[in-house]
Amino acid sequence: MKVKELVSGLKKLTGCYPVVLMNGEETLGLSRDFHNDGSDWAQLSLVVRKPMNLDTEFLKVVLDYCARQEHHSLFSDETPFEEFEVFASQKESEDAFYTIKILKCGMERVNDVEVFALHVEEIFDTDKVND
């Protein structure tokens, strides 16, 4: 599945276009198509703390997660972390499993625009660390 197909799917799911961010700045070339000045982002924010290859498999897992949720009820600091494993290949290194934590997600208003925001954190699987 291509990234643009995932974007289209999320648009149908949430009623707004996502902007894909990596480390708060990398947009994978998508954001320029979906916002004017950056203030009214309807965004799917993939916030990762360690460099990784954001491939379509990772995005597919995130989108599948979104599709199963009640978005409006999840945007809360009291929401417990949701964790799942995702397989991500890294450039010039071994393939690795990552644990993805959903920090929070849901519909919110930004500058009078209804947006869907999803914040995730990736953590390298501790099973890979030597005892």
Regions found by a protein language model. Give the residues of each.
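DNA replication sliding-clamp ring fold and its partner-interaction surfaces
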Residues: 1-15, 59
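Detector for the mature cores of small, proteolytically processed
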Residues: 15-131
